[in-house]
Amino acid sequence: MSKVMLLALGTLWLFAAGCARNGVLPAAIPGLERMTDEQKIAYVLEDVWRGMEARRVYQVLAHVSPRYLDQEGRDYTAIQEHVSYIMKAYTSIKITRMRPKIWIAGERARAVETFGTIAAPRDERKDPPINLQGQVMVYLERAGGTWQIVEWGPLQ
């Protein structure tokens, strides 16, 4: 076994031993605990964007609150069905977005997302191609230390 491989295995073993001894990482990951609420919300919105483009329903829904309810009357179950349908009906989803504008008031926040979306349908007879630009308002609440989406819809 090469010296490099032995060094790598030794380092991994020491890391694992440190974790087993304390039950936690031996050192804090730099920056993680110091993220501002605005950065955490921006991360949530970015992860939803990545989930939409990758067509991963559960990556998107991981950030949606069970208390979700939008102006169209969709609750969590309905938004889950809607997102699932979009993922199945379209072969590719490409989203361009600007940095969101975020306002925080205690345990609640709102963000304006400016975006452009292009999506190609699997069956154009059933679903039209999407070429949409605009802005949406996203409302979030802090729950258990994390920010979750409770509504998104048109600007008011």
Regions found by a protein language model. Give the residues of each.
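Hydrophobic pocket/interface hotspot
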Residues: 48, 56-61, 68, 79, ...
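Surface-exposed, charged secondary-structure patches
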Residues: 85-128
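Short, low-complexity N-terminal intrinsically disordered segments enriched in polar/charged residues
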Residues: 19-54, 62
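Solvent-exposed loop/turn segments at secondary-structure junctions
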Residues: 67-69, 117-119, 156
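Soluble non-cytosolic domains of exported or imported proteins
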Residues: 35-43, 51-58, 70-80, 127-134
